Design a protein with these regions (language model features):
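Sec-dependent N-terminal signal peptides
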Residues: 4-14
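A contiguous strand-loop segment
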Residues: 19-119, 139-295
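Second-shell loop/turn segments in exported
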Residues: 111-113, 121-130
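Glycine-rich, aromatic-lined ligand/substrate-binding cores of catalytic
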Residues: 221-372, 376
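Substrate-recognition/cap regions that form aromatic- and gly/pro-loop-enriched pockets
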Residues: 323-459
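Histidine-centered catalytic/metal-binding microenvironments
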Residues: 440-541
């Protein structure tokens, strides 16, 4: 069996086992249609997440907001509520502001468990209180500085129809109720990504239009003896969350794979992403792609398994994917065999995704129509994305199903139906995935193709009244989601019938064949794929 061997200086610096996510970002001049786009794969084992909704509201003076930890649901305290809060559906609000995240951990001693706000609270409160990305940064940092931040180090994606930003934040230690943070605007013609490793290094403190930071971002490091250089040379990542082997191989390699899709120059950063060379040149925060990216490009990037790269999961001799070579691996990522430490690769697409999205933000359309959260409730590779417009004020039933949760199955719930199908396909991937992909791609293509027509109709209604457009887009978003659920249920039935008991029943155009006497046609018994059989026989010798 092909083995990956641990780098000798692997260190446990961050809680990567619990919160491993990926964000991809596209500036408006780097997209094919002028959209700002960003993505989120929320990856956490055991995670069950509905499409959340916070309705727009006005709050009387003196109203307090209860704060519950997003990961644990533990009560953290309360803060004064804002007089006005905006409609939020998933991770986009009615002004098209979108916020996502990945956890990088950083120095353990900087965590302040006494803070009131966790990273999830900052996201959803920020969405409820902001109309632009810059305003969201101000809201989130002001709240963290006033009430304390209790999570590990975090990278936030913060976008609106005109700008894309990333912000990194860490606490200042137990009881401090203080944070260090820096936010950098991604150039309009660039793409960026982050994946559980701090990415902001040096930043131009004089560039007030494109850089924001806390007053203590450098002085705090000096006070701890972690930095003694000039302000201009200060490196946020190296000081507060220097990448170890895992930070490079399991995290930065995902960024590399995204960049590698759109730039031929990424070969020189392979040594950095591999994690073995301590002096390898780090990747830039962003790159200018060699071509502009479409919505479909981002959906495809979210399904990445390092195909055709040095990190591919289908290398010759690697039987870790099982008989039918799934591009997934059991976790934890690291494991031990006869005293030798080994590890698996960690691609963008991963089985523990609770939900995924591609957010599309467009400045030239009315805000109710311009923002679309292309949403799915499982690993991006195994599901289609359905459109949820930012004005939606009632989540589709399949994305918010009463009674369904992490331990309660519901046939009406997208998470459970999508996971049901995925978990049939994973162990027999090369056999069953083509059938899944055909349905997935047909739905993706149909929704993207119909988008102009749907938005033309919404625009006609908007000319009459915004409420009519909102009602139409609520109905359209729900229709697409329920159509997807129906197709996925049919797919589940097809798969269990066709591939029952490790056989393959013949079919034609989706209809199973019968014998001349009305019985099921003779099944095929495919046996081992040739590559797997060859490796298995090698192990016997």
């Amino acid at each position: 069996m092909y083995k990956q061997i641990f780098f000798s200086v692997l260190m446990a610096v961050s809680p990567l086992g619990a919160d491993c996510c990926t964000n991809l970002i596209v500036g408006k001049d780097a997209s094919t249609d002028g959209s700002v786009m960003c993505t989120y794969s929320a990856d956490d084992y055991g995670m069950f997440q509905n499409l959340c909704h916070y309705p727009a509201a006005r709050h009387p003076k003196g109203t307090m907001r209860q704060v519950y930890d997003w990961d644990t649901n533990a009560y953290n305290g309360q803060i004064p509520e804002s007089p006005v809060t905006y409609n939020v559906i998933g991770n986009i609000n009615e002004y098209q502001v979108t916020i996502a995240e990945t956890t990088f951990g950083g120095r353990e001693e900087m965590v302040d468990s006494t803070g009131t706000l966790d990273y999830g609270s900052l996201i959803y409160i920020g969405l409820q209180r902001s109309r632009t990305a810059r305003e969201a940064i101000e809201v989130m940092t002001t709240l963290a500085e006033r009430y304390g931040y209790n999570s590990y180090g975090e990278t936030f994606t913060i976008c609106d129809p005109d700008e894309a930003w990333i912000m990194e934040m860490m606490g200042c230690g137990p009881g401090s109720k203080s944070v260090v943070w820096v936010a950098v605007r991604i150039p309009d013609n660039a793409i960026c990504a982050h994946a559980n490793q701090s990415r902001i290094r040096k930043f131009d403190r004089k560039d007030k239009d494109n850089v924001m930071y806390s007053k203590n971002v450098v002085s705090f490091a000096r006070s701890k003896g972690w930095y003694d250089g000039t302000d201009a040379d200060f490196d946020f990542c190296s000081t507060y969350a220097a990448p170890d082997f895992g930070g490079r191989r399991w995290c930065e390699a995902r960024v590399w794979s995204f960049f590698n899709r759109f730039a031929k120059s990424m070969d020189k950063y392979v040594p950095y992403a591999e994690g073995h060379s301590p002096n390898a040149e780090p990747m830039p925060l962003w790159i200018v792609p060699e071509r502009k990216l479409s919505l479909a490009d981002l959906e495809a990037a979210m399904r990445d398994h390092y195909e055709g790269t040095p990190f591919a999961l289908d290398k010759p001799g690697d039987i870790g994917g099982g008989i039918w070579q799934m591009p997934y691996r059991p976790t934890p990522l690291e494991y031990e065999v006869d005293g030798q430490k080994c590890f698996n690769e960690r691609p963008i697409s991963t089985q523990q995704a609770g939900f995924v999205f591609v957010s599309q933000m467009r400045s030239w359309l009315p805000r109710q129509i311009g923002g679309v959260l292309w949403f799915a409730n499982d690993d991006a590779n195994m599901v289609p994305f359905t459109p949820i417009y930012c004005c939606v004020n009632k989540p589709p039933h399949c994305y918010d199903t009463p009674g369904a949760d992490a331990v309660t199955f519901s046939p009406d719930n997208a998470f459970w139906i999508q996971n049901w199908v995925s978990n049939m396909v994973y162990p027999r991937y090369s056999q069953m995935f083509p059938a899944l992909r055909a349905v997935r791609d047909s739905l993706d293509s149909a929704y993207i193709a119909f988008q102009p027509e749907a938005e033309a109709r919404a625009s006609e209604l908007y000319a009459q009244s915004a409420d009519k457009a909102v009602a139409y887009l609520n109905g359209y978003s729900a229709k697409c989601a329920e159509e997807m659920l129906g197709r996925w249920k049919k797919l589940a039935v097809f798969l269990i019938v066709k591939y029952n008991d490790m056989t393959v029943k013949p079919d034609s155009c989706g209809r199973f064949l019968r014998s001349p006497h009305g019985l099921g046609a003779t099944v095929e018994r495919p046996g081992y794929p040739a590559a797997y059989a060859r490796e298995m026989e090698k192990l016997k010798k």
